[in-house]
């Protein structure tokens, strides 16, 4: 296990909290453990904010969860498999873990995936500190695996970036990840599909639209519309993506939601992001 002083140093370097760095370190080892298991490696495609940071853009915002799409609809995340993942993490890092929750996800009485919460006692502690009961641990990782998702682009092989003094295994030298276009098309759909308005979705679309190279927005729009139809949703106009209600909600939550994931000096004002996204959405969907 890395030392607490490394967590402290990285927190100062990135201008975020120690708990954010501790979780980032732990996330890397969870990805490593998951892709060290053949059944996971063969079925799972890494996606989401942690994928963007770990596999595409090393100085991207920090993330909190692990998200995957399974290309095998028969894949099962049961307690035995999850404990196998945990055992690998513990063996490689010395991290103490506690399985908090494992849930079957369902929609209209049909299984759609799995969500797990694993508490961890990470590196942000003195080595001689005895961990309290897991009920008092405040750090955890959420893992979500979706079984039924329409993928429009081939996955791409990426290496997991791990900016810490310990090392990951060769299992993550190449792992299957979402194409950036796939990420963006799902982020667009999330603006409509989520039951809550997530500032990170707006930030991710804004950031990738500005800094990702050679994006084909016609392909992304097509994929977005296909994904909407796959979920039984209809796109009627950009007011579904940005409207007074969502803007007010996101603006109020902007700093609280993203402030622990990005240094304050790097976090753009929501009004700047909103202005850029209005222009982007009007350009992409001008014929709809």
What residue ranges belong to the model's regions?
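Structured mid-to-C-terminal alpha-helical surface segments
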Residues: 1-44, 54-60, 64-66, 70-288
């Amino acid at each position: 296990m890395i030392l607490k002083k490394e967590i402290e140093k990285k927190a100062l370097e990135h201008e975020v909290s120690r708990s954010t760095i501790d979780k980032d370190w732990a996330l890397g080892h969870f990805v490593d453990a998951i892709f060290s298991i053949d059944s996971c490696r063969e079925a799972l495609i890494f996606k989401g904010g942690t994928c963007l940071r770990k596999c595409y853009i090393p100085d991207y915002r920090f993330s909190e969860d692990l998200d995957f799409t399974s290309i095998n609809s028969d894949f099962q995340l049961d307690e035995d498999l999850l404990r196998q993942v945990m055992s690998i993490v513990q063996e490689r890092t010395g991290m103490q873990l506690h399985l908090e929750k494992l849930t079957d996800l369902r929609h209209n009485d049909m299984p759609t995936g799995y969500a797990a919460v694993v508490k961890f006692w990470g590196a942000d502690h003195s080595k001689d500190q005895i961990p309290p009961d897991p009920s008092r641990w405040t750090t955890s990782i959420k893992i979500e695996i979706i079984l039924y998702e329409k993928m429009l682009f081939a996955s791409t092989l990426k290496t997991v970036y791990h900016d810490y003094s310990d090392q990951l295994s060769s299992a993550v030298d190449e792992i299957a990840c979402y194409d950036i276009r796939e990420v963006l098309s799902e982020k667009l759909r999330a603006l409509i599909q989520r039951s809550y308005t997530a500032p990170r979705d707006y930030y991710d679309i804004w950031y990738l639209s500005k800094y990702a190279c050679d994006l084909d927005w016609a392909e992304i729009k097509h994929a977005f519309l296909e994904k909407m139809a796959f979920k039984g949703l209809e796109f009627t106009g950009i007011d579904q993506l940005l409207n007074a209600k969502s803007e007010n909600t996101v603006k109020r939550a902007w700093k609280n939601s993203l402030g622990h994931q990005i240094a304050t000096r790097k976090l753009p004002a929501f009004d700047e992001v909103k202005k850029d996204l209005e222009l982007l959405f009007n350009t992409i969907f001008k014929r709809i």
